[in-house]
UniProtKB/Swiss-Prot annotation:
Cytoplasm as UniProt keyword: no
Organism annotation: Pseudomonas syringae pv. syringae (strain B728a)
Family matches, as HAMAP family: Ribosomal_bL31_2
PANTHER family attached to this UniProt entry: 50S RIBOSOMAL PROTEIN L31, CHLOROPLASTIC, LARGE RIBOSOMAL SUBUNIT PROTEIN BL31C
Pfam family, one: Ribosomal_L31
Classification lineage: Bacteria, Pseudomonadati, Pseudomonadota, Gammaproteobacteria, Pseudomonadales
Biological process, per Gene Ontology: translation
Family label: Belongs to the bacterial ribosomal protein bL31 family. Type B subfamily.
A GO molecular-function descriptor: structural constituent of ribosome
Name of this chain's protein: Large ribosomal subunit protein bL31B
């Protein structure tokens, strides 16, 4: 293997700005920013918009209103579909 071609693997401080959560993770990400962690050590710093601490899939706070809206729209659109056939059958008898 060629020397000095691989990125440096190190501990990096990731900050989820939406949930204000910090994660120390081993990574090869290239960043010039550093920040001091609560343990007193200064680590390379990367800000994240979304992580497992703030993503609705992982937090269990999924937006069910969108799904309920789709179901309500479907039921509203096809509400008369099944009832029209029943009325015609009842009127024919």
């Amino acid at each position: 293997m060629k020397p000095d071609i691989h990125p440096q693997y190190r501990t990096v401080l990731f900050h989820d700005t939406a949930a204000d959560a910090y994660f120390l993770i081993g990574s090869t990400v290239d960043t010039d920013r550093t920040q001091q962690h609560t343990d007193g050590t200064t680590y390379p710093y990367v800000a994240l918009d979304v992580s497992s601490a703030s993503h609705p899939m992982y937090t269990g706070q999924q937006r069910k209103a969108t799904t309920e809206g789709r179901i309500a729209g479907f039921n509203k659109r096809f509400a008369t579909f099944g009832s029209a056939g029943k009325k015609e059958t009842a009127a024919a008898q």
